[in-house]
Every structure is written in structure tokens, then in C-alpha cells.
Amino acid sequence: MAHVRTYNPRVRVGNWKEDVTLEEETSKEFILQKDRGELTVQKEGALKQSILKPVSLSVSQDGFLHFGDTVMLVNCGDGGHMQRSPCVLSIIADSSNVTSHSQTNTGPHLLGPLQVGGAHSMDPCVRNTFIIISVDGSSDGEVVRYDQSFALKTTGGFAGELFLASDHKSFQKCAKKSRLQELSLVEEFDFLCWWKVLYFDPQDRLENEGYPVQVNNKVLISHCKTNQCLAALSNHILWSQFGKEYELTAHTFLDSHKAEQDNNHWLFSTAHPANQSQSLLQLQQEEHKENQEDTQVKDCS
């Protein structure tokens, strides 16, 4: 009996039946989730495909901003010592922010509240386009005037029609990096979603009050409740699945002359009348880049 082998690799020991059953159940659950598109990699892929879908911007024939226009909010950056690159107000979301209601047969869409950031991609898409909404009964097509209240809403469909909102900062609610006043996209529309456009030059601000807002020109976007202006912070970086982005807050940065700094200068970017697939700012930047290249070639020759 001393030479009899009582064990070989084919012998199952321990709770082998439970282990086999658990492995089979895990495999079945994985296949079921894959068929329903519920795997994390599938959700992230579907999110990027939906949120980066191109969107056509509005064309301003008269050069003014109108209620109902689809625009991008662009901070042109700073060419000085700060070297802040241009950025666009954009949605920050992941797969946990996507929901669908099978009971009402609606497709997947974003669920608020969501973060926003300053993305560097200038291509108009679901993520960075917003609709100008009236809050005082003005009809679509009417011009937006300086110091007139309005709201910013994401596009319909996947973007979920969320509203850009802000409120006074507190210990529990503030910007993640800078600890300044937080910006977010919310589902409920109230006074926290009201904004107004101010003329960027404080010396001429009173004279321009009530005049139509020009598109593709520098303006200030002020929050009606807190009187803080939309700002891009290049010294506070947010990392998302879309890359490195600037933190955006509602905070007014003043220089020694009590004038708002470049952090607070924004423009409503619309489409070029001749090429609606691109924004007017994109075409201007491409022309500027081509001119710089031509100048460098001439200097070298």
C-alpha cells in the first residue's frame, strides 16, 4: 500500500462543483452583457461615438446672435506669458452618466448633473455645441442683446437637453481643482441657469447695453445670480477620457485697471456661410496658419 498513488492531477479536490458552476455562470453573464452592449468597453465606445457626432452650427446672416442659434462658446486663449491655448466649453461625461428608459422607448442619453471643461478640439459636435434659449418670452430668431438674460442648453437627443448652471461656492460644492464657483449641466431649469452677455470693454459697457450681441466677437458671459463671469483656467488641468482640458469656473478675474482679463473673454462661434461644416473661427485660424507658413517660407528664401 505504501507504493499506491492516491492522487493525480485529474483528481478534483475541495469545492470543485461550486467552482465549476461559478465559472459557467460568470461566462454566461459575460456573454449576456456582451449581447446587450453592457460591457464597459462597449459603453465607452458608444459614448464616444455618440458624443463626438458632428453638429451643424447656425449661420448668422446679419452677424448677430439670435435665440435658437446653435453655437460653440470659445475662449480664444492668451498669446502672452500665460500661453493659454484656445478652448471650447464642452461636456465631460463617462459611461456612468448615460441612461436609457426602455419603458418609454427612448434611446440612450446623458443624465445630469455633469461636469464641463475647456476642450481644445474646435470641431463642432454634440459635446461642445449649445443652443441659446430665451428666459423672458422672446421667440426664436430674435436677436440677443447685451445685458439680456438667456440660458444655454445642450442639443437634443443624446446630449439630453441639459442646462448650464452655477451657484455660490460652498465647502461641499465648488470647482474640483481651483475651489472656485462650480459650473455644471443640470436637468432642472431654474434661475441658476440664467446668464447674460456683457460688452467686454468696461469703458464702453454702459453705452452698448441693449444693443445686439455680435457673433465671433469677444464678450463676457455673466451669471445672473452671482454676477461672476465664465472663466477658463489654464493652470488647473482636468483629465478625462477625451484628454487634457482646462477647468472652467464662474469667477471674474480683474486686472490692475479693474477690467476683466482674457480668462473671461469668450465668443459665440457660428458656422461660416460658405462652409457650414466648419466654424468661422476654424477657417480664420487655418488662414492665419497658412499666412504664417507663407511668411516663414519667404523669410527662408
Curated annotation (Swiss-Prot):
Subcellular location(s) per record: Cytoplasm, Cytoskeleton, Cilium axoneme
Domain of life: Eukaryota
One of the GO biological process terms: cilium assembly
Annotated keywords: Cell projection, Cytoplasm, Cytoskeleton
Observed effect of gene inactivation: Morpholino knockdown of the protein causes strong ciliopathy phenotypes, including pronephric cysts, axis curvature, left-right asymmetry defects and hydrocephalus. Cilia length and number appear normal, but outer dynein arms are missing and cilia are paralyzed.
Example of a GO cellular component annotation carried by this entry: motile cilium
The keyword Cytoplasm is annotated on this UniProt entry: yes
Protein task: Microtubule inner protein (MIP) part of the dynein-decorated doublet microtubules (DMTs) in cilia axoneme, which is required for motile cilia beating.
Protein name from the UniProt record: Cilia- and flagella-associated protein 161
Source species: Danio rerio (Zebrafish)
Lineage, opening ranks: Eukaryota, Metazoa, Chordata, Craniata, Vertebrata
Gene giving rise to this polypeptide: cfap161
